[in-house]
Amino acid sequence: MIAKTFSSQGALGKAIPGFQARQAQIDMAEAVAKAITQQSQLVVEAGTGTGKTFAYLVPALLSGKKIIISTGSKNLQEQLFHRDLPLMVDALGFFGNVALLKGRANYLCLDRLSRQMVESHTNEADPQLLTQLVKVRSWSSETKSGDLGECDELPEDSLIIPTITSTNDNCLGKECPSYVDCFVSKARRKAMDADVVVVNHHLFLADLAIKETGFGELIPEAEVFIFDEAHQLPDIASQYFGQSVSSRQVQELAKDIEIGYRTEAKDMRQLQKVGDKLTQSAMELRIVLGEPGFRGNWREALSSPSVARELSRLRESLDFAIDVLKLALGRSQLLDTAFERANLIKGRIDRVCDVSITGYSYWYDTTPRHFSLHITPLSVADKFHEQIELKQGSWIFTSATLAVNDDFSHFTHRLGLKPQAQFSLPSPFDYEQQAKLCVPRYLPEPNSAGLADKLVQILAPVIEQNQGRCFFLCTSHNMMRELGERFREVLTVPVLLQGETSKQKTLAEFMELGNALLVATGAFWEGIDVRGDALSCVIIDKLPFTAPDDPLLKARIEDCRLRGGDPFSQVQLPDAVITLKQGVGRLIRDKNDKGALIICDNRLVTRDYGGVFLASLPPIPRTRDLDKVKDFLSQISVTTQNN
């Protein structure tokens, strides 16, 4: 049945102009069909161009079973639901119901919107935010889904989004005056009735973690579970099987208390004081936690007198909030929920401050305005395995980056998987002709002083000659900022820096300019798809080993050591290989793409483990001569102009 569907005279060939199946795609589709029939686990590494999406959609839709498809990113989730699934549904004549389900932070909350509208009249509102609020209110009367991603007038990084969406903590549930029209409830009900539901890993794992306590109903009772971008699952699972609390939760609580005071309990002036104290104490703790963009060891931070002092003040503010809110119980649903939230947040802070429990990593991270405190299990293998055992069905995991030197054990061990089959699909790209890999000669040591200056000196001529069209992927924010600054001093082509505007705007500007250098870090290493001449060179500053002082890594290393393992080969090296494969994957996106990859790290050729990295990368011809890279890029440029 599968082979027939993928044949030139089959359903796909008839429905999709120019469709040509590849043998690797058929092999994967048959393996997925077998896993569905046998209710087994399957792991497949399938890179760009292999056609993996159709390879799992076809057997899934033909099976007639209830299916959940989970993606790592919202981008892929949207693409699957709006582009790939409709194509397959039409081609196969599928008559089942299909639903898209996102986390509640993506849906407009009508009750919170109406409260914000009232609040905006009583307060000195920012004119720009007020304009956005009015546009959202207008859109709210037209939308069927309530998905804010569909509101074109609203920037994706708008500051009003947290104020007009709900969280698990602040949702009023059935007590909400807008419950009948609630977009989250509608989306969930639709998902419960659907045959195919497209979710993302965060939503799936949040529900799985809730199921662990017996309350997870969000994900319908499916029989087939397919995870695309599955390499992200272990880290995301760690978040959901752990515990966290953030200053954002405290400040949102403070804001809701102030709204309750202004609109429903004007005689309780203490509520204003509660809001002010909560906001102030959260800000003071943020300040003593240090520079933004930092991930630190929470156990160590707690021994700092200034951190202990501000944490104590935050706890006092929460106690004060609980005492005052207790007096307001019964006055309004908003304040009743705020009382519950204050108790929840206090409980979470108590939990993350009990650092005596073994088997967990205690850490914190900071942004310019906020902090988060986390307790994360060092391994989710037992918990994830237990959930799979509880829910008999077919579990299929696929991604472009799962194997390290053709070995899947790093991925399968982290999730406690026991797949009946695991394999990699061969790439359809002709890397011999399409790409060149260079580790330049005379590179400084990766962490040496003046590294940025030296890299700019070596690489500026290549970037200039190529007229930009280049990603420079960095392993740290500091290196990214330093390189961005230096390149702006010496290059004539535009230099874009990640973080100066939103990711989407940065990418759109890069495409529009057509001759830019984009210097970026984490967010651009994966999930970015730039095809054609817009991108013909990817440079990586060094091998992406996680910083040795990262508290999560340190905890995993210690855990590995206690189990008698080798932390470098079992933790640090596999993590870095997977990340490098993701970065390298930005270059060649289809069979017509051509480009050069430059990795500025001698360890690829001077250390034994360099061979593990190289063996895990596509078979790209290698050189150490940057002049050969320039020649290759010149040929690409000439070919493009002639075409």
Locate each region found by the language model.
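A substrate-engagement module of RecA-like helicase motors
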Residues: 1-15, 65-195, 258, 290-293, ...
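Conserved RecA-like ASCE P-loop NTPase motor core of nucleic-acid helicases/translocases
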Residues: 67-75, 396-398, 468-475, 598-600
